[in-house]
Regions:
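Compositionally biased, intrinsically disordered low-complexity segments
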Residues: 1, 61, 84, 107, ...
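Aliphatic-rich helix starts adjacent to a transmembrane/signal segment
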Residues: 2-4, 8-66
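Acidic/proline-rich low-complexity IDRs
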Residues: 3, 32, 80-82, 93, ...
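Exposed loop/turn and edge beta-strand positions of beta-sandwich/beta-sheet ligand-binding modules
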Residues: 16, 111, 168
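Short linear sequence elements within intrinsically disordered, low-complexity coil regions
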Residues: 39, 45-46, 61, 120-123, ...
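Type IV pilin-like appendage domain
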Residues: 72-150
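Short linear sequence signals and composition-biased patches located at protein termini or domain-edge surfaces
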Residues: 132-182
Length: 182
């Protein structure tokens, strides 16, 4: 009987075990690469969502800041951009005086609407005097800050999508148009 198998070519049990081990190592490497790529994809997707939401809010603030109308040389109540908490130069609320008249004349100059941005709960609210809406509905806002220096409005928005440890902060600055009529 030994004579039958003596010259036959075949695969030994040791070779089969080695092949199985090599295949399992390759499978583990490929699966760990897949898991890492999925984790990277999910993290990147969350950052993109936060970025889009914050970008929309910042553009909204910028657009209305550029429409602000007021007198920076008079009392603070006529300034185009107002931070209601005057004791603190940085605040979570921003009021913008908008004149919707077209064209703006000396007779309708003082007819203004106040647009407000403020943090309420976990969102950034825009109030146009008639309705209120959340500017960032898809993400959780953890911090909002507005600071007014001489002729600039600066601030930041901090938000996260699903994991508070992965919060992102977006900074912005606006230089509203200044005009003086004598």
């Amino acid at each position: 009987m030994n004579q039958l198998f003596k010259n036959k070519k075949g695969v030994t049990m040791a070779e089969i075990i080695m092949a199985a081990l090599l295949l399992s190592l390759i499978f583990l490497a490929v699966s760990s690469l897949y898991v890492a790529s999925q984790k990277f994809y999910l993290g990147s997707s969350q950052k993109v969502i936060i970025g889009y939401e914050a970008q929309y809010a910042i553009q909204h603030i910028y657009k209305n800041t550029m429409r602000a109308i007021g007198d920076e040389t008079s009392s603070p109540s006529t300034s185009g951009i107002q931070l209601p908490n005057t004791a603190n130069p940085s605040t979570e609320r921003l009021d913008i005086r908008i004149n919707a008249n077209d064209p703006v004349t000396s007779s309708n100059y003082s007819t203004v609407t106040i647009y407000s941005y403020y943090k309420s709960g976990n969102t950034l609210i825009f109030d146009n005097g008639v309705t209120q809406e959340s500017l960032i509905p898809k993400v959780t806002v953890t911090a909002v800050n507005f600071t007014k220096t001489t002729n600039a409005l600066t601030g930041y928005i901090t938000a996260y999508y699903s994991d508070p440890a992965k919060a992102l902060t977006f900074y912005f600055s606006c230089y509203p148009r200044q005009a003086s009529f004598n």
